[in-house]
């Protein structure tokens, strides 16, 4: 474990200060000799920290990819740089190249498999909170062995990982805010104290005795929770108010379930059709099929019937016709053979009398 922790101080870190520097860091002025590669890495960490801290949940896929890339790269670099690979001791550049390639694969897996990405995000949150607890308890507690910090890191990481799988939205927001604030504080620590606070964290994880921190280090350490709180508030009130990646996943799952049900229903219908016995062909000549009714859309309308005045009988004519049939008004019919009291212009009977002609 001490050898693994020593690999954290590779080429990005400046030379380790001596005991006199640890003894009086506030009185002795710092020699700020910046290098190009560490400065570039710290600037990129600051930019990614801003994205993590204030836009973490909105950039959900990007956060999962970067978290997987970070875990894969760090773990593989420590293994390759510390251990012998194929009986060959790899250099720092070769180890960094291998770690970057495997880290890209881990990032893709974390981005595509949502549960893996959430587990890594929660694990990172637990590790950072455990490291913050070690830093905060520095004036009051000194671990006797390395197993105390190691158990705290593993326990906190697994607990936060499981809680993130249970409540993804609030804990992802908290994890991204804390991670982004830690990246910004690390970049500020490099430009202010040449990663003196980072070395202090490593020594605390190794359970090594270290002197108390200077006020500059405590100010940089106080920047971490302050930025974390700001990031949580900004994401809760602004950037994550209308976004919910959980609802998107649930809607996709419902759509898949509906498609599966439709396919199952179609398969059942096909099985029922196959189970039905085929109908026997009818004996004898088959009659030609009857033509079906024409389509109502193409049916011709009937020709409208024209009406004239003589087509409608007057009520007086109908009454006189009834009287003639019963024989009750024979004299009146002979006196006035035509009915002039008409309404629609009928001037004569439309039909002849059914009885024999009467002679007068």
UniProtKB/Swiss-Prot annotation:
Bias type Polar residues, positions: 326-339
Transmembrane portions of the chain: 36-56, 59-79, 93-113, 116-136, 145-165, 177-197, 218-238
Pfam families with a match to the protein in the record: TM7S3_TM198 (PF13886)
One term under GO cellular component: plasma membrane
InterPro entries given in the database record: TM7S3/TM198-like_dom, TMEM198
Membrane topology of this protein: Multi-pass membrane protein
Broad class of where this protein is predominantly found: membrane
Subcellular localization(s) per the UniProt record: Membrane; Cell membrane; Cytoplasmic vesicle
GO biological process, one term: Wnt signaling pathway
Keywords: Cell membrane, Cytoplasmic vesicle, Developmental protein, Membrane, Transmembrane, Transmembrane helix, Wnt signaling pathway
Keyword Transmembrane helix in record: yes
Biased composition (Pro residues): 279-296
Family to which this protein belongs: Belongs to the TMEM198 family.
Function comment: Promotes LRP6 phosphorylation by casein kinases and thereby plays a role in Wnt signaling. May be a membrane scaffold protein involved in the self-aggregation of LRP6 to further enhance its activity.
Summary of subunit composition and partner proteins: Interacts with LRP6.
PANTHER family, sorted: TRANSMEMBRANE PROTEIN 198, TRANSMEMBRANE PROTEIN 198 FAMILY MEMBER
Name assigned to this protein: Transmembrane protein 198
């Amino acid at each position: 474990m001490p050898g693994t922790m020593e690999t954290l101080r590779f080429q990005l870190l400046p030379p380790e200060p001596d005991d006199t520097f640890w003894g009086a860091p506030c009185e002795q002025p710092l020699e700020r000799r910046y290098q190009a590669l560490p400065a570039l890495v710290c600037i990129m960490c600051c930019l990614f920290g801003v994205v993590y801290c204030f836009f973490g949940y909105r950039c959900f896929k990007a956060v999962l990819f970067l978290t997987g890339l970070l875990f894969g790269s760090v773990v593989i670099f420590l293994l390759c740089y510390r251990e012998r690979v194929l009986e060959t001791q790899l250099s720092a550049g070769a180890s960094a190249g291998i770690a970057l390639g495997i880290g890209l694969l881990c990032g893709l897996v974390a981005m595509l498999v949502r549960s893996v990405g959430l587990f890594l995000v929660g694990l990172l949150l637990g590790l950072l909170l455990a490291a913050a607890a070690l830093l905060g308890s520095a004036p009051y507690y000194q671990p006797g062995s390395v197993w105390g910090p190691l158990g705290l890191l593993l326990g906190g990481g697994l607990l936060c990982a499981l809680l993130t799988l249970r409540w993804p939205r609030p804990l992802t927001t908290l994890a991204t805010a804390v991670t982004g604030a830690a990246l910004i504080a690390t970049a500020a620590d490099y430009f202010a104290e040449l990663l003196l606070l980072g070395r202090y964290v490593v020594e605390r994880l190794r359970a090594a005795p270290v002197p108390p921190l200077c006020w500059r280090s405590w100010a940089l350490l106080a920047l971490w929770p302050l930025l974390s709180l700001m990031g949580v508030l900004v994401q809760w009130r602004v950037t994550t108010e209308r976004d919910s990646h959980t609802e998107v996943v649930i809607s996709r799952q419902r759509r898949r379930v509906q498609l599966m049900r439709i396919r199952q229903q179609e398969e059942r219908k096909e099985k029922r059709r196959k189970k039905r016995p085929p109908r026997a062909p009818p004996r004898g000549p088959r009659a030609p099929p009857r033509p079906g009714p024409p389509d109502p859309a193409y049916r011709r309308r009937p020709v409208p019937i024209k009406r004239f005045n003589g087509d409608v009988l007057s009520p007086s004519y109908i009454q006189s016709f009834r009287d003639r049939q019963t024989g009750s008004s024979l004299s009146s019919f002979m006196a006035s053979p035509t009915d002039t009291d008409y309404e629609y212009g009928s001037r004569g009977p439309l039909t002849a009398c059914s009885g024999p002609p009467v002679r007068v």
